[in-house]
């Protein structure tokens, strides 16, 4: 099964990716992991990517696409893969189609974990951190025993700037603007499958599993 996993920050994409790869035994291929492996192995494309990143520049599409092509050509992708973080643009999505065609593969589904914006805001702005112990809490999902106080050292919990509502809202808007053309592209192609992410983790995975079980032999 050849899959792409999509979802805005806070949608629970990482959790579901772990469950999918554990159940179906396909590699979880994230953009970051691909870049790190290519740079560590000092491949030609990896060294090119490193030169751009060291200069603080965006890695050009042709380098990224080449790294993706190399990764999807590896033996562990013979029975499928779960792509995460690629493609990010319609141009990359079109390049991925060419890559898969050259490898005699085809995409099965693009799974989009869909969560209402307000719930994403609640999830992402609820994190609190102890400035001394570094321990992390969540006001809804993992609250401290005493509100606003670290269980470990009694310090007053803080909200990081990255977790403040105005920052989170802007990040979600940027991500949604980037994701929408891809969602439209894959919807028109018939690959897109929206999964309701506004439910328990186990229930989200049940819905994904229901979709995928027809693909597994």
Curated annotation (Swiss-Prot):
GO biological process, one term: AMP salvage
Catalytic activity: AMP + ATP = 2 ADP
EC number: 2.7.4.3
InterPro entries named in the record: Adenyl_kin_sub, Adenylat/UMP-CMP_kin, Adenylat_kinase_CS, Adenylate_kinase_lid-dom, P-loop_NTPase
UniProt region (NMP), positions on chain: 30-59
Region feature LID, mapped onto this chain: 126-163
UniProt keyword annotation of Cytoplasm present: yes
Pathway(s) per entry: Purine metabolism; AMP biosynthesis via salvage pathway; AMP from ADP: step 1/1
GO terms for MF: adenylate kinase activity; ATP binding
CDD domains: ADK
CC per GO annotation: cytoplasm
PANTHER family referenced in this protein's UniProt entry, alphabetically: NUCLEOTIDE KINASE
Function description: Catalyzes the reversible transfer of the terminal phosphate group between ATP and AMP. Plays an important role in cellular energy homeostasis and in adenine nucleotide metabolism.
Subunit relationships: Monomer.
Comment, domains: Consists of three domains, a large central CORE domain and two small peripheral domains, NMPbind and LID, which undergo movements during catalysis. The LID domain closes over the site of phosphoryl transfer upon ATP binding. Assembling and dissambling the active center during each catalytic cycle provides an effective means to prevent ATP hydrolysis.
Family matches, as NCBIfam families: adk, PRK00279.1-1, PRK00279.1-2, PRK00279.1-3, PRK14527.1
Name of protein: Adenylate kinase
């Amino acid at each position: 099964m050849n899959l792409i996993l999509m979802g805005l920050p806070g949608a629970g994409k990482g959790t579901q990716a772990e469950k999918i790869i554990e159940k179906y035994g396909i590699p979880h291929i994230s953009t970051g992991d691909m870049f790190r492996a290519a740079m560590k192995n000092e491949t030609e494309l990896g060294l090119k990517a490193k030169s751009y990143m060291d200069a603080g520049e965006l890695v050009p599409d042709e380098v990224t696409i080449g790294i993706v092509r190399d990764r999807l050509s590896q033996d562990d992708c013979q029975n499928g893969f779960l792509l995460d973080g690629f493609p990010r643009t319609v141009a990359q999505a079109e390049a991925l189609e060419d890559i898969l065609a050259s490898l005699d593969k085809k995409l099965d589904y693009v799974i989009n974990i869909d969560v209402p914006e307000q719930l994403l805001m609640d999830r992402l702005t609820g994190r609190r951190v102890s400035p001394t112990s570094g321990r992390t809490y969540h006001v809804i999902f993992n609250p401290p025993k005493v509100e606003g106080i670290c269980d470990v050292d009694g310090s007053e919990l803080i909200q990081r700037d990255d977790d403040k509502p105005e920052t989170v809202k802007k990040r979600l808007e940027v991500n949604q603007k980037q994701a929408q053309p891809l969602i439209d592209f894959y919807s028109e192609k018939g690959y897109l499958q929206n999964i309701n992410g506004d439910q328990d983790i186990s229930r989200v995975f049940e819905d994904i599993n229901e979709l995928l079980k027809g693909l597994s032999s």
